[in-house]
Swiss-Prot record:
Assigned keywords, A-Z: NADP, Oxidoreductase, Porphyrin biosynthesis
Origin organism lineage: Bacteria, Pseudomonadati, Pseudomonadota, Gammaproteobacteria, Lysobacterales
Residues annotated to bind NADP(+): 181-186
Protein name listed in UniProt: Glutamyl-tRNA reductase
Subunit structure: Homodimer.
Length: 432
């Protein structure tokens, strides 16, 4: 059987196609149930996120997987990538580590890979091959993240701003944060802030219903934008990212808020273009203003740091791929080795039982031992000897060379039968 990965991601397909390709809600367990019934597919797992849909499977025929995908998610063929065996192993390790993510080094993907593994196990599509692969992938991701700084620094504007806020007002559970707007940047900031257990979260927006929805998701309080100035003084930290054409937080607003706060410092992040906060706010004592340009410099430095860490992580993954494939190779040879050992022990036990019976019947020990030795020799050597003769007649030099490696010729010792057979083959084989 062969290990395959078929999938698409943010690099190969646009958002609308990724949405159509995803398996969410009840669709995922139904898909796994369908995969379990496919012929010649021993194991399967589905990884489905907003940025990727991937099918991991053990099968002799990748076309079966392609046909299944076309049936369940038509129109993806031109956007799919396919990886096999070592390339498939490498791909999973890179995905779990965050090296294949839209945001380099992001950690959320590891949890999503674990969910994929867990779901496949629950629905009976996970066997020894994929279980071993995913478990090894988890270890590789942990090792890479522990031994590099691949995920150490934030690489989005929102996460960088939250990190600066955490550094300035630590801990956040003693701070009040005001978010202005409900767009993607503010949503991401709200997520990071709620993870940091901010004490109080206020959300102001022109459309109050959107503010209420975001507030309900993160345990905050919604405000109409018209009441912004009434609550400005309550905020230790302000994040603003709206589409307003002119600033909505003015120098005079902040000056009044600082007066009410008795000059207790305020930290303000203007994440909007055009700006939401007047630049003059940055000139006020006890008001610390950061703009997108300020944050972008920090973000780029963090990205550079992650790119450097990614090079080290890639080297770790290459080493782990080799080790994993070596382990698979070793496992592949276990079955014939077990059969060889079973053949040897069974032969030994059978002839030993016969010898003991002969001794019990009064047969001379020397005769019994000699017969036992001859019997063992003949029984154990007959199968490989016959196989080597057939190999020589068929000009199968690979098997003959393997035998020569196992039993190297010593000085003064010859294998006349084997040598004669090989010479005969060379002389009589018209193809040689």
């Amino acid at each position: 059987m062969t290990l395959w990965v078929l999938g698409l991601n943010h690099q190969t397909a646009p958002m609308e196609l990724r949405e159509r390709a995803s398996f969410v809600g009840d669709a995922l367990p139904r898909a796994l149930d369908s995969l379990r019934n496919l012929p010649n597919v021993n194991e399967a797992a589905l990884l489905s996120t907003c940025n990727r849909t991937e099918l991991y499977a053990e099968t002799t025929n990748a076309q079966i997987l392609l046909n299944w995908l076309e049936q369940h998610r038509p129109g993806l063929q031109n956007h799919l990538y396919q990886y096999r065996d070592a390339a498939a192993v490498r791909h999973l390790f890179r995905v779990a580590t965050g090296l294949d993510s839209m945001v380099l080094g992001e950690s959320q993907i590891l949890g999503q890979v674990k969910d994929s593994w867990s779901m496949a196990r629950t629905h009976g599509t996970l066997g020894n091959t994929l279980d071993r692969l995913f478990q090894h992938g988890f270890s590789v991701a942990k090792h890479a993240r522990t031994n590099t700084r691949i995920g150490a620094n934030p690489v989005s504007i929102a996460s960088t701003a939250v990190r600066l806020a955490q550094d300035a007002f630590s801990p956040l559970n003693e701070s009040t944060v005001l978010l202005i707007g409900t767009g993607e940047t503010i949503q991401l900031a709200a997520k990071h802030l709620s993870e940091g257990r901010v004490q109080r979260l206020l959300i102001a927006n022109r459309t109050h219903a959107k503010a209420q929805m975001l507030a309900s998701q993160h345990g905050g309080y919604a405000l109409p934008l018209t009441e912004l100035n009434l609550h400005l003084a309550e905020a230790d930290i302000i994040f603003s990212a709206t589409a307003a054409p002119t600033p909505i937080v003015t120098q005079s607003n902040v000056e009044s808020a600082l007066h009410i706060r008795k000059r207790k410092p305020m930290l303000l992040f203007d994440l909007a273009i055009p700006r939401d906060i007047e630049t003059e706010v940055g000139t006020l004592t006890d008001a610390y203003l950061y703009t997108i340009d300020d944050l972008e410099r920090a973000v780029e430095e963090n990205r550079r740091s992650r790119r450097e860490a990614a090079e080290t992580a890639e080297a770790i993954i290459e080493l782990q791929v080799k080790r994993y494939m070596d382990t698979l190779q070793a496992h592949a040879h276990q079955a014939p080795l077990r059969r060889l050992r079973t053949f040897g022990t069974t032969t030994r036990d059978e002839l030993l039982t016969r010898a003991r019976q002969q001794l019990a019947n009064g047969r001379p020990a020397e005769e019994v031992l000699e017969q036992l030795a001859h019997g063992l020799t003949n029984r154990l050597l007959h199968p490989p000897t016959a196989a080597l003769r057939e190999a020589a007649l068929a000009n199968n030099t690979e098997l003959v060379r393997a035998a020569e490696q196992l039993f190297p010729e010593k000085p003064g010792y010859h294998h006349p039968t084997l040598q004669t057979t090989i010479v005969k083959t060379d002389e009589t084989d018209p193809a040689s």
